[in-house]
């Protein structure tokens, strides 16, 4: 359903905060549907899972089976977390757009899961009312989609069903919710709005427009789409192939037919060339027959070659550079800079970087010089790094990370 890149977080009850799972690192997190019965053995349509796999070593960092009663919290545009029973998971996204896309897919999966779990309970409601109330799932509640979740609970759950809420929903009076639920049950037939296509994204957008705490986030996410229709409406596609861009941009619309009449005579010579085979071949063939693809390491677009690889990638694994770092014992210099010359956040510059702006450059180079006396192999880093650079420029195998196309 969706695939994003984020850092998987876990709740630390001892400190009361969130910590990265497995030492951190970006993971490929996806919401997907698994065919077959759920582990509980309830629904027949299949179940939905949230699966996370770290890009660095393909290690599974997140495995969560979705069930009704999930409580979703949106702390800020790029950090969301949810709880399911005693389990708590969190994700730190790279952009608000990816976070919004993940939340919409999660809402869609839970809406489909709720409809699937309500089907058997509605058929057995006439025989055993107690089973109907026991099988009724708790709807999803979140900071952003509180209105849509309340309308979802009004139409699918009885007035006495428990509703999972979050701390931000305390601003609403609790006494008015059963009354609104009864009135909606009397005026609208149950389950009718949910018999068609799932509409979690539309309800989310509607809740954002009426939002009680997410109006800023909704305006931020929806601020981009309006410009593309304006740009498409102002361009004239009819004159793009005739080369009359100057007349379309500067001249009035009345003067545009003149270039068309002048361009009409060259049109007949263009028709005969498609008949012979040799002429259209140079026009259709691109210089290197390359296609645009997305890199699996940095998620950037690149021109894919015949071997499926592209240019240099800073985040791609580089065995040659790793060998240079190990042979020169560069980790000793990094450890020295981290423990002695790092800032308040624990960041430090590269040991061999000559970039200006360091607060204590003299102390930094003096410490590295003293360390090189104790670890002489540090002096080999410069020539080894130069050899690696030459090998990467020559295209030697194992030297220099390259863009690789993501698996489809």
Curated annotation (Swiss-Prot):
Role: Tyrosine kinase substrate that inhibits growth-factor-mediated activation of MAP kinase. Inhibits fibroblast growth factor (FGF)-induced retinal lens fiber differentiation, probably by inhibiting FGF-mediated phosphorylation of ERK1/2. Inhibits TGFB-induced epithelial-to-mesenchymal transition in lens epithelial cells.
Pfam families: Sprouty, WH1
Protein name per its UniProtKB record: Sprouty-related, EVH1 domain-containing protein 3
Record PTM text: Phosphorylated on tyrosine.
Membrane topology: Peripheral membrane protein
A single BP term in Gene Ontology: negative regulation of transforming growth factor beta receptor signaling pathway
Gene name of the record: Spred3
Residue ranges annotated for the WH1 domain, each copy included: 1-113
PROSITE patterns per record: KBD (PS51488), SPR (PS51227), WH1 (PS50229)
InterPro entries: KBD, PH-like_dom_sf, SPRE_EVH1, Sprouty, WH1/EVH1_dom
Localization in the cell: Cell membrane
Region (Disordered): 118-226, 256-286
Modified residues (Omega-N-methylarginine): 246
